A protein has these predicted regions:
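Terminal amphipathic alpha-helical/low-complexity segments used for targeting or macromolecular assembly
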Residues: 1-60
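Flexible, glycine/small-residue-enriched loop-and-beta-strand segment within the central core
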Residues: 42-139
């Protein structure tokens, strides 16, 4: 947990301390709950995994499917509205900003056609995902 928190401090100039990350960053909470939910998902306790992930969604506004594979040091900054789908595979040291959806890439009317196939993106290491970014300079 210490390396994870330090990796966020290294990437976010607004992060002041590890304690502030734990108490005030929803992305930290979402990743923590995902690790627990994923443990239960891998162990085939799917209902428990989904309950944990839905509690996390309620608490943080970030939805991570328990089956998603997430590498080390995922940083979800300003996480409201982030969705990470079931077959997503995320590498190490990835940063995701608000409103990003790693959703299904093959929509279908018949969900049976999509069971047990890869339908969400794979994200490599050291990637930053920003959706709809608008940067303003000092004067607009």
């Amino acid at each position: 947990m210490g390396n994870f928190l330090q990796s966020i401090i290294d990437r976010d100039p607004a992060a002041k301390s590890k304690l502030s990350l734990i108490l005030t960053y929803p992305g930290v909470k979402a990743v923590f709950f995902h690790r627990i939910a994923n443990f239960f998902s891998v162990a085939k306790f799917d209902l428990i995994a989904r309950i944990i992930s839905q509690f996390s969604r309620f608490l943080t506004g970030i939805e991570i499917h328990p089956g998603a594979k997430i590498g080390k040091n995922l940083f979800i900054d300003h996480g409201m509205g982030v969705v990470i789908g079931e077959t997503s595979d995320i590498g190490d040291n990835v940063t995701i900003y608000h409103m990003a959806t790693l959703g299904g890439i093959a929509p279908s009317i018949n969900s049976n056609d999509q069971r047990n196939i890869k339908r969400h993106p794979t994200i490599g290491d050291e990637i930053v995902i920003e959706i709809g970014r608008a940067s303003c300079r000092e004067r607009v």
